[in-house]
């Protein structure tokens, strides 16, 4: 969300470096690596009392092109997402999304 990022005191663009990506079938692991890094940043921000939101960029070609142009990124860096960080207007109570029926043990037990 470009409007949100423009108003925030901080935005972090998480990029995959294709010069360091694995070869062959493992090449797309950069998405998982960057996603794990993103989640760690979100958790750290929350732990510091900051608000944060993960805004997706990749695999949208239009979004990737816009971020690449704005930041003058070289071709080997692919922007996965932008993390917008700021100060929340109020404390939000976490939602309890736990549902026992969403858990399966040893095999999938849900609707086929």
Predicted regions and their residues:
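Acidic, surface-exposed loops and disordered segments
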Residues: 1-112
């Amino acid at each position: 969300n470009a409007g949100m990022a423009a108003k925030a005191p901080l935005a972090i663009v998480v990029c995959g470096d294709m010069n360091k990506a694995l070869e062959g079938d493992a090449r797309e692991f950069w998405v998982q690596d960057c996603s794990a890094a993103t989640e760690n940043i979100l958790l750290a921000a929350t732990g510091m009392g900051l608000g944060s939101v993960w805004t997706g960029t990749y695999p949208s070609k239009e979004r990737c092109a816009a971020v690449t142009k704005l930041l003058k990124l070289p071709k080997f860096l692919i922007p996965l997402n932008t993390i917008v960080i700021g100060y929340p207007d109020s404390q939000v109570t976490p939602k309890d999304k736990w549902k026992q029926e969403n858990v399966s043990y040893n095999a999938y037990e849900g609707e086929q």
